[in-house]
Amino acid sequence: MTTELAAAPVLSTPDDRILEETDPVVPQTNRILSEEELAITYDIERTLKEIRQARYKRIALQFPDEMLPDAPRVFQLLSRGLEARDIVDGGSKANTETEPTDGLVDSASRLDLKDADEWSPKLYILADTSYGTCCVDEVAAEHVDADVVVHYGRSCLSPTARLPVIYVFTHKELPLDPVLKAFKETYPDPETKVILAADVTYSDHIPEVYSRLVQEGYSSLFATALVHDPSSVIPNRTVPDSVKEAPESLGNWQLFHISEPPTALLLTLASRVAAIHIYPTDGPAGTDVKPLPASTAMVLRRRYAILTRLSTVPIFGILVNTLSVKNYLHIVDHVRDKIAAAGKKSYMFVVGKLNAAKVANFSEIGGWVVIGCWESSLVDSKDFWKPVITPFELEVALKGDEERVWTGAWQSDFQSILDQPPPSSNSPGNSQEANEGPEFGDHARDEDEDAMSEPESAPPEFDLRTGRYVSYSRPMRDSAPRVSASQGATAAISAQTGAADGPSAARALARRAKGDLAMVGNTFSPGAEFLRSQRTWTGLGSDFNSAANVEYDDEENDSTLVVQGRKGIARGYTVGDSIDRH
């Protein structure tokens, strides 16, 4: 026998739950660093030296989430260091004023003293980053009008657009004896060509590892150093002189990498070096660690499968995932032009930190292109509903089936795409020869016939993943007929006579007669077409749609007056003034 509820069940979170103890978002470190260890880890002396030399006044400190607990102590160390320097400078300048000097030296010292009084640096700790923690957050730094950003932790080293940066990679301890033992077991032949590299947080150990291996008898080693060049043969690392002269000779070298590298680096080097061995640093101390051979075959095959899936996508979304990397606006324009040249439509989005929930709201988009740093552009997650690719992968996806050849080469830095020379025409003189001679009329007539029969004569496109025929993969090419040579020659005559002759007018009339394409402001919109044909719910506001001249449905009902609906709770509703419950 069931009992009736005296009150409705509680379906919300209690108000006092916020006062209860919850798990911390950032895990606590095992131990608190001493002041000396903190100064070494965060490179306080070098940071103070660079701030004093450049005389920065407003300094922004950017920490990743795992280093935020140390941010107040780092702030105090930097503040005390700058104040102590000011006191020392003031005392030294006061002593020099008592010494006999000539007028020129005395005036110069007074100018220096005036500058020292005006130079009062201020430090700011940036809160949450707008994008990835590996990138410099110039947007947050501009909120405090910063002159420089001190970036802590690992970084992608992408060049910034506006502000100078002081990189502090922090120092991490690394036992060298296990590293040397693992290296000798992996490469027993001392003549093997091996490049030594490490993650940026362990890069300061590379010179010591190199010197000790040379003492062991290894003669064909190269120790990399950090450089700010993501477009390098080895991104952000120096390479041997022989590789600078002939980049393809990098295939004769093997790579020994300390700590787990980012996936973008592995994919980039997979086709450039002979082999990659990774020395893990996340294992327990005191245990024998064996380097693991890197294998990127599965990841590369999955990336290529994504490209074949996107070859027939009609609408692309451009995700701007950075506002700080240099030349990001140029690559946005480049990607937009490439998509438009392929007859497809693109929409641009600025979403901040990328996650699956944000991009899932736009079901019209068939694929996403990320514009970001060379590390964050690679999004290899299965949580996203639609594929997310890089600008390099877009170049491959937009090629035809007969041109798309997957060689295994992969790159994530978009600057290398911008540096590529523009494609040259096969025969530069053809355009001039076509406009001369009596056969120009026949040539123009052939172009007119091609323009009229373009949709019918275009080769069919199939989705290589499903095998289905795709009839709507290039909506912008079909909706915007190209202008033939005869149309350009008779443009003035058509304007004077007001005639609507030519194949373009016939095609435009045929398109309007079909009524299959959604128009917004007399312009074809693939997004509106998707909303009209595939979405079952178009949202509220039919009056607004009519006023904006947006036609989604020819059978759309007119708006009606607002009437009183149901009211009550889930146990029973009443309609209008009726007392009956439903």
UniProtKB/Swiss-Prot annotation:
What Gene Ontology terms describe where this protein resides (cellular component)?
2-(3-amino-3-carboxypropyl)histidine synthase complex; cytoplasm
Obligatory cofactor(s)? [4Fe-4S] cluster
Q: How many cofactor units bind, and how? A: Binds 1 [4Fe-4S] cluster per subunit. The cluster facilitates the reduction of the catalytic iron-sulfur cluster in the dph1 subunit.
Q: Which residues bind [4Fe-4S] cluster?
A: 135, 156, 373
Report the superkingdom from the record. Answer: Eukaryota
Keyword RNA-binding tagged:
no
Keywords of the record, alphabetical order, are:
Cytoplasm, Iron, Iron-sulfur, Metal-binding
What are the GO BP annotations of this UniProt entry? protein histidyl modification to diphthamide
Q: Which InterPro entries does the protein's record reference?
A: DHP2, DPH1/DPH2, DPH1/DPH2_1, DPH1/DPH2_3
Outline the segment boundaries, as ranges, of region: Disordered.
416-467
Query: Example GO molecular function term?
Result: 2-(3-amino-3-carboxypropyl)histidine synthase activity
| Keyword Zinc among record annotations | no
Specify the pathway.
Answer: Protein modification; peptidyl-diphthamide biosynthesis
Subcellular location(s) per record: Cytoplasm
Looking up Pfam families in the UniProt record yields: Diphthamide_syn
Q: How does it assemble?
A: Component of the 2-(3-amino-3-carboxypropyl)histidine synthase complex composed of dph1, dph2, dph3 and a NADH-dependent reductase, predominantly cbr1.
Family per similarity comment: Belongs to the DPH1/DPH2 family. DPH2 subfamily.
Role noted for this protein: Required for the first step of diphthamide biosynthesis, a post-translational modification of histidine which occurs in elongation factor 2. Dph1 and dph2 transfer a 3-amino-3-carboxypropyl (ACP) group from S-adenosyl-L-methionine (SAM) to a histidine residue, the reaction is assisted by a reduction system comprising dph3 and a NADH-dependent reductase, predominantly cbr1. Facilitates the reduction of the catalytic iron-sulfur cluster found in the dph1 subunit.
Report the protein name in the record: 2-(3-amino-3-carboxypropyl)histidine synthase subunit 2
Highest classification ranks of the organism:
Eukaryota, Fungi, Dikarya, Ascomycota, Pezizomycotina
Q: Which gene encodes it?
A: dph2
